[in-house]
A protein has these predicted regions:
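A glycine-/small-polar-enriched, mobile loop at the entrance of the PLP active site in fold-type I
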Residues: 18-24, 44-52, 134
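Active-site core segments that coordinate phosphate-bearing ligands/cofactors
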Residues: 1-13, 22-33, 37-38, 55, ...
Length: 230
């Protein structure tokens, strides 16, 4: 919304991001009057609502000049990052399923209509395709390995700098020498709470079963296995 406003002067938003505001109704695709009243704001103070991918306008002349682009360049609405990722891999029809592992591990399934879980285990988002929805759950993914690298992989980071390579390559090479199952070392990667199978913001990460025989490579592999199997 902010970038589009800076580029075009228009104040607009779209459903997949508005889902996170708590004042947009995913069923009616309108602002939620009850919540607006509670917050003490009016619809006039909020962005107009568009569908994802809908053209908003052309670049403002001063922005086009700064970016070196034609002032006729059309700016369109985007979508939530995981929505864009799912559409990018072809997840565009109800019944399809995709998974993305980056900083987070996200699972997305396209739905014709929102199906709400009374237990709150599966968030539902508006999708980047009109009148389509997404069941979307996520947990910590690559950020767990980054945490390990930053806190326990200083040696690997130094070696990687000398060899002009990525420290993750070195961590991966070391982990590959450990047998599947990490010799009994098990990890739960809930370093920022858990979303599934039950939403639990108080969930914590766990290393279980480690002994004197386990090495740094075992811990690196246990993290990779945890992310892969979750």
């Amino acid at each position: 919304t902010d970038l589009i406003h800076r580029m075009t002067g228009e104040l607009v938003a779209e459903g997949s991001l508005l889902c996170s505001t708590l004042y947009w109704n995913i069923i009616t695709k309108k602002y939620w009057d009850e919540m607006l009243d509670f917050l003490g704001i009016t619809e006039d103070q909020l962005p107009s609502i568009r569908e994802s991918g809908e053209p908003v306008g052309e670049l403002k002349p001063e922005v086009a000049e700064e970016l070196g682009l034609s002032p006729r360049t059309v700016v369109a609405t985007g979508a939530l990052d995981q929505v864009c990722g799912a559409i990018g891999v072809g997840n565009v029809e109800p019944g399809m399923f995709s998974e993305n592992t980056g900083a987070a591990l996200a699972i997305c399934a396209v739905l014709e209509k929102p199906i709400f879980d009374k237990e709150g285990r599966m968030p539902i988002h508006y999708y980047g395709i009109p009148d389509t929805y997404m069941a979307h759950t996520f947990t910590t993914g690559g950020m767990v390995l980054r945490w390990y690298r930053d806190n326990f992989g200083r040696e690997e980071m130094s070696v990687a700098e000398l060899l002009d390579t990525d420290p993750y390559n070195i961590l991966g090479d070391e982990a590959s020498k450990v047998p599947p199952g990490s010799d009994g070392l098990v990890m739960l990667p809930h370093l920022q709470g858990a979303m599934a199978p039950e939403a639990n913001p108080k969930a914590k990460g766990v290393f279980f079963g480690f002994t004197l025989k386990h090495t740094k490579a075992h811990f690196a592999r246990a993290i990779m296995e945890a992310i892969g199997f979750i």
